[in-house]
C-alpha cells in the first residue's frame, strides 16, 4: 500500500474522535494582515487554519477546545487553546514564548492533537527575575494576565506583559495534573522565590556576657561648659543661697536591672513604684514642747481672797 500527499499541507487525521495533524508553525509577528495582532503574544492561544475548524466540527469535541503541541525532534510538548481559525492552510501561528518552550524555529513542524484536561485547583509559579518583586500586587496582575490563557503545563515558562514590560514565570507545579485547564476555575496561586533572588543579610548580634562589665565607650564625655550653672546677681546686692546641683551620674555608677522572666509577648504591664508612708511618732518632751494656754492668768484688779 502506498500513500501519496497531493497537497502542499498535511491532511488532518482522525482516530477515535481525536483531532491530530502536523502544521508548520510561525510566530505571530509573521502573521499577514493590516491589523496588529500583538495581543496574541500576551496569551496562551494559537491561530489555526479554517480546515481545522471543519474537522473539529465533525467530531464530538468537548468545549473549550484544547490542544497538545509536540515537537518530536526535541521531545518537548505543551498545551494551548485556539483563538481564531484564520491562518493559511498548513500553517499555525504561535506566541513567541511558546515556540521557545518547544525549541521550534520559524517554519518548524509541530504535532497538534486535541485533548481533554482537568480543571486546575492549584498552581505555583517562579519568577525568572527579581524585578517581579517590584509589582505591588503580583497575584492581581497574574490573575488578569491568565485570562488570555486556556491551560497551564508544568515546566513551561510563560510570559506576561505589565506596564510595558515582559515578565517570565516558570510553572513549577499544577494540580490535579501536570497539564490543567484554567478556564472558569477557582485556582489557588502560590509564588516561589524569584530566580537569582538573595535575601538581605541581617547584622549578627553578638551576645554580651552577663557577668562582664558593660562597654561604655559610646557614652559622651563630660562637657566643660554648662548653661545656667553659675551664681545669680540680685539688684539689692544680697546673695541668695543656691543649693548645689546634683553631680551627674557617671557611667560606672549605672547598674543592670533584673529582667522580668515572667514577661509574656503581647501583654503590657504598668508598674507603679508605690512607697509606703513611714509613720513618725514624736515623743513628748516635758520641757521642750509648747502647749497653748498653759500659763498663769493675770487680772487688772486684785481681789482679796476670803478666808
Swiss-Prot record:
Protein family per UniProt: Belongs to the UFD1 family.
Pfam families: UFD1_N1, UFD1_N2
Keywords for this protein: Acetylation, Cytoplasm, Nucleus, Phosphoprotein, Ubl conjugation pathway
Main location: nucleus
PANTHER family reported for this sequence: UBIQUITIN FUSION DEGRADATON PROTEIN 1, UBIQUITIN RECOGNITION FACTOR IN ER-ASSOCIATED DEGRADATION PROTEIN 1
Record PTM N-acetylmethionine, positions in chain: 1
Region of interest (Disordered), residue spans: 230-255, 282-307
Protein name listed in UniProt: Ubiquitin recognition factor in ER-associated degradation protein 1
Complex formation: Interacts with USP13. Heterodimer with NPLOC4, this heterodimer binds VCP and inhibits Golgi membrane fusion. Interacts with ZFAND2B; probably through VCP.
GO biological process, one term: retrograde protein transport, ER to cytosol
GO cellular component, one term: cytoplasm
The UniProt record lists the keyword Nucleus: yes
Underlying gene: Ufd1
Gene Ontology molecular-function annotations: ATPase binding; K48-linked polyubiquitin modification-dependent protein binding; polyubiquitin modification-dependent protein binding; protein-containing complex binding; signaling receptor binding
Residues found modified as Phosphoserine: 129, 231, 245, 247, 299
Function: Essential component of the ubiquitin-dependent proteolytic pathway which degrades ubiquitin fusion proteins. The ternary complex containing UFD1, VCP and NPLOC4 binds ubiquitinated proteins and is necessary for the export of misfolded proteins from the ER to the cytoplasm, where they are degraded by the proteasome. The NPLOC4-UFD1-VCP complex regulates spindle disassembly at the end of mitosis and is necessary for the formation of a closed nuclear envelope. It may be involved in the development of some ectoderm-derived structures.
InterPro entries from the UniProt entry: Ufd1-like, Ufd1-like_Nn, UFD1_N1, UFD1_N2
Amino acid at each position: 500500500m502506498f500513500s501519496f500527499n497531493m497537497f502542499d499541507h498535511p491532511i488532518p487525521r482522525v482516530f477515535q474522535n481525536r483531532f491530530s495533524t502536523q502544521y508548520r508553525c510561525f510566530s505571530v509577528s509573521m502573521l499577514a494582515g493590516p491589523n496588529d495582532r500583538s495581543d496574541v503574544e500576551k496569551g496562551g492561544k494559537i491561530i489555526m487554519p479554517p480546515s481545522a475548524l471543519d474537522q473539529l466540527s465533525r467530531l464530538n469535541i468537548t468545549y473549550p477546545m484544547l490542544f497538545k503541541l509536540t515537537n518530536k525532534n526535541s521531545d518537548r510538548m505543551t498545551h494551548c487553546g485556539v483563538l481564531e481559525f484564520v491562518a493559511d492552510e498548513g500553517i499555525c501561528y504561535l506566541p513567541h514564548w511558546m515556540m521557545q518552550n518547544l525549541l521550534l524555529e520559524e517554519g518548524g513542524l509541530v504535532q497538534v492533537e486535541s485533548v481533554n484536561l482537568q480543571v486546575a485547583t492549584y498552581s505555583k509559579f517562579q519568577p525568572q527575575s527579581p524585578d517581579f518583586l517590584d509589582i505591588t500586587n503580583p497575584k492581581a496582575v497574574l490573575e488578569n494576565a491568565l485570562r488570555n490563557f486556556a491551560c497551564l503545563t508544568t515546566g513551561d515558562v510563560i510570559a506576561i506583559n505589565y506596564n510595558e514590560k515582559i515578565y517570565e514565570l516558570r510553572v513549577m507545579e499544577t494540580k490535579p495534573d501536570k497539564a490543567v485547564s484554567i478556564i472558569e476555575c477557582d485556582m489557588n496561586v502560590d509564588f516561589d522565590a524569584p530566580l537569582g533572588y538573595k535575601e538581605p543579610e541581617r547584622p549578627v548580634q553578638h551576645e554580651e556576657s552577663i557577668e562582664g562589665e558593660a562597654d561604655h565607650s559610646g557614652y559622651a564625655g563630660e562637657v566643660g561648659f554648662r548653661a545656667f550653672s553659675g551664681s545669680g546677681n540680685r539688684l539689692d546686692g544680697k546673695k541668695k543661697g543656691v543649693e548645689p546641683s546634683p553631680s551627674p551620674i557617671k557611667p560606672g555608677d549605672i547598674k543592670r536591672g533584673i529582667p522580668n522572666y515572667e514577661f509574656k509577648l503581647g501583654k503590657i504591664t504598668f508598674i507603679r513604684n508605690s512607697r509606703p508612708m513611714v509613720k513618725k511618732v514624736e515623743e513628748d518632751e516635758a520641757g521642750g514642747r509648747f502647749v497653748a494656754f498653759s500659763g498663769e492668768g493675770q487680772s487688772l484688779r486684785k481681789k482679796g481672797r476670803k478666808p
